[in-house]
């Protein structure tokens, strides 16, 4: 086998590989003989079909298969010999056969050489937060509201009330599609409607008819309504006040607490809040570290890896549509290219961090991650056992652990400052509610 390597552009490489023709002819001959032994052709005894007949019937297909196998096998031998690391599947183009040799070309991309830079320039503001008694009380108040019952009242509508109404919306005096509803229910303060709609109902009583002026946001989904001033003619038919359950042992029982009553509920709430806080703190620091790593390291990305990631993201997006995908056209790659490129770059950079620091997934950390995730389920031990018995899930958890270890390794050289922050403020920002 003879090999020549050509760097065409960027990460693309072109291998020209020559293989002795006699090697291919021997493989073709051997394959024809094997086929002759098992072929069943009318007019010939089993195993006695002449090679010429087999060659006439199956020769072209057999030769094509052999050529494919030869190209694949010799390509692998060539990249090992040349110490090349392909980033995707090669494209094979068969060349000439002059009787002495068979030549073919393999084109592919290689992984870029990654040299980590600016690790000591990464800046991280590490938030410090804890769950206080007041935070637990706030959560209990939220749970009370979620379990509220409503009853009609004869007073002005206030924040937190549930109202029923009929309304008609218009822009420039003309009703618009989707702007009319009867017996519409709305909890004031829920933020379901456009700005100004809910506040415009405050202070009105059942039976009143009134008009409120609002403006559709510039980012509103309907193109014909973006940024437009609108009027809503409203007839308020009912105002319902919330009746919140008392905070006692009976309240705790609503959440499956059979022993320990209210104190047990508070302990469970605190545990869940602490778990969510820990996850959010980790995610916050990780995002800062990753952003710093990306900003300080510019690398050329293999198109093959980006294309592969685009396909993954596209499939995930289609799965979210569920049964609605049957008649949907394929989502364009452009929707996912930027995110795919970011994910590929992160993977390459973190891979180099793992390699440089000789990191291996710590078993204790892996089990800790599984236990933390399982604690959110009714039977944690069952979830832990399931993960430990599933090779694919275990590999996923090892990858998560390795990523955590890589981030921790980067933190050691980063410029880290700590900042005290209240639980509610931090979690609101983390969940996008701020």
UniProtKB/Swiss-Prot annotation:
<dbReference type="InterPro" id="IPR008881">
    <property type="entry name" value="Trigger_fac_ribosome-bd_bac"/>
</dbReference>
<dbReference type="GO" id="GO:0003755">
    <property type="term" value="F:peptidyl-prolyl cis-trans isomerase activity"/>
</dbReference>
<dbReference type="InterPro" id="IPR008880">
    <property type="entry name" value="Trigger_fac_C"/>
</dbReference>
<keyword id="KW-0963">Cytoplasm</keyword>
<dbReference type="InterPro" id="IPR037041">
    <property type="entry name" value="Trigger_fac_C_sf"/>
</dbReference>
<protein>
    <recommendedName>
        <fullName>Trigger factor</fullName>
        <ecNumber>5.2.1.8</ecNumber>
    </recommendedName>
</protein>
<dbReference type="Pfam" id="PF05697">
    <property type="entry name" value="Trigger_N"/>
</dbReference>
<keyword id="KW-0131">Cell cycle</keyword>
<keyword id="KW-0132">Cell division</keyword>
<dbReference type="GO" id="GO:0005737">
    <property type="term" value="C:cytoplasm"/>
</dbReference>
<comment type="similarity">
    <text>Belongs to the FKBP-type PPIase family. Tig subfamily.</text>
</comment>
<dbReference type="Pfam" id="PF00254">
    <property type="entry name" value="FKBP_C"/>
</dbReference>
<comment type="function">
    <text>Involved in protein export. Acts as a chaperone by maintaining the newly synthesized protein in an open conformation. Functions as a peptidyl-prolyl cis-trans isomerase.</text>
</comment>
<dbReference type="InterPro" id="IPR046357">
    <property type="entry name" value="PPIase_dom_sf"/>
</dbReference>
<dbReference type="GO" id="GO:0051301">
    <property type="term" value="P:cell division"/>
</dbReference>
<dbReference type="GO" id="GO:0043335">
    <property type="term" value="P:protein unfolding"/>
</dbReference>
<dbReference type="GO" id="GO:0043022">
    <property type="term" value="F:ribosome binding"/>
</dbReference>
<dbReference type="GO" id="GO:0061077">
    <property type="term" value="P:chaperone-mediated protein folding"/>
</dbReference>
<dbReference type="Pfam" id="PF05698">
    <property type="entry name" value="Trigger_C"/>
</dbReference>
<dbReference type="GO" id="GO:0044183">
    <property type="term" value="F:protein folding chaperone"/>
</dbReference>
<feature type="domain" description="PPIase FKBP-type">
    <location>
        <begin position="160"/>
        <end position="245"/>
    </location>
</feature>
<keyword id="KW-0697">Rotamase</keyword>
<dbReference type="GO" id="GO:0015031">
    <property type="term" value="P:protein transport"/>
</dbReference>
<keyword id="KW-0413">Isomerase</keyword>
<dbReference type="InterPro" id="IPR027304">
    <property type="entry name" value="Trigger_fact/SurA_dom_sf"/>
</dbReference>
<dbReference type="InterPro" id="IPR036611">
    <property type="entry name" value="Trigger_fac_ribosome-bd_sf"/>
</dbReference>
<dbReference type="InterPro" id="IPR001179">
    <property type="entry name" value="PPIase_FKBP_dom"/>
</dbReference>
<dbReference type="GO" id="GO:0051083">
    <property type="term" value="P:'de novo' cotranslational protein folding"/>
</dbReference>
<dbReference type="InterPro" id="IPR005215">
    <property type="entry name" value="Trig_fac"/>
</dbReference>
<keyword id="KW-0143">Chaperone</keyword>
């Amino acid at each position: 086998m003879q090999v020549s390597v050509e760097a065409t552009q960027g990460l693309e490489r072109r291998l020209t590989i020559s293989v002795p023709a006699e090697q291919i002819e021997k493989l073709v001959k051997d394959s024809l003989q094997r086929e002759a032994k098992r072929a069943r052709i009318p007019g010939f005894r089993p195993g006695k079909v002449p090679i010429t007949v087999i060659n006439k019937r199956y020769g072209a297909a057999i030769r094509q298969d052999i050529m494919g196998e030869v190209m694949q096998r010799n390509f692998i031998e060539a990249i090992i010999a040349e110490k090349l690391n392909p980033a995707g599947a090669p494209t094979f183009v068969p060349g000439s056969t002059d009787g002495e040799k068979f030549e073919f070309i393999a084109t592919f991309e290689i992984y870029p050489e990654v040299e980590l830079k600016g690790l000591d320039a990464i800046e991280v503001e590490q938030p410090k937060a804890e769950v206080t008694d007041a935070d637990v009380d706030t959560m209990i108040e939220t749970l009370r509201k979620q379990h509220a019952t409503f009853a009609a009242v004869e007073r002005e509508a206030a924040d937190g009330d549930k109202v029923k109404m009929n309304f008609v919306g218009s822009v420039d005096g003309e009703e618009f599609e989707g702007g009319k509803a009867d017996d519409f229910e709305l909890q004031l303060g829920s933020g379901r409607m456009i700005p100004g709609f809910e506040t415009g109902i405050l202070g009105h009583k059942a039976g009143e008819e009134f008009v409120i002026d609002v403006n559709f946001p510039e980012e509103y989904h309907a193109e014909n309504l973006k940024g437009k001033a609108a009027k809503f003619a409203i007839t308020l038919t009912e105002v319902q006040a919330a009746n919140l359950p008392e905070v006692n042992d009976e309240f705790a029982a609503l959440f499956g607490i059979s022993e320990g009553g209210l104190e047990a509920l508070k302990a469970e709430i605190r545990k869940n809040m602490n778990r969510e806080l820990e996850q959010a703190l980790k995610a916050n620091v990780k995002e800062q570290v990753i952003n710093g790593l990306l900003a300080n390291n510019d690398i050329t990305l293999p198109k093959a890896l980006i294309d592969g990631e685009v396909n993954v993201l596209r499939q995930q997006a289609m799965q979210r549509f569920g049964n609605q995908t049957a008649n949907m056209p394929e989502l364009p790659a452009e929707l996912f290219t930027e995110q795919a490129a970011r994910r590929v770059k992160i993977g390459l950079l973190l891979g180099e961090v793992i390699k440089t620091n000789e990191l291996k997934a710590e078993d204790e950390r892996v089990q800790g991650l599984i236990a933390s995730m399982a604690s959110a389920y009714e039977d944690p031990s069952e979830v832990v056992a399931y993960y430990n018995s599933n090779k694919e899930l275990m590999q996923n958890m090892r990858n998560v652990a390795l990523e955590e270890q890589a981030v921790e390794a980067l933190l050691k050289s980063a410029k880290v400052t700590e900042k005290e922050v209240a639980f509610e403020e931090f979690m609101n920002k983390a969940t996008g509610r701020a």
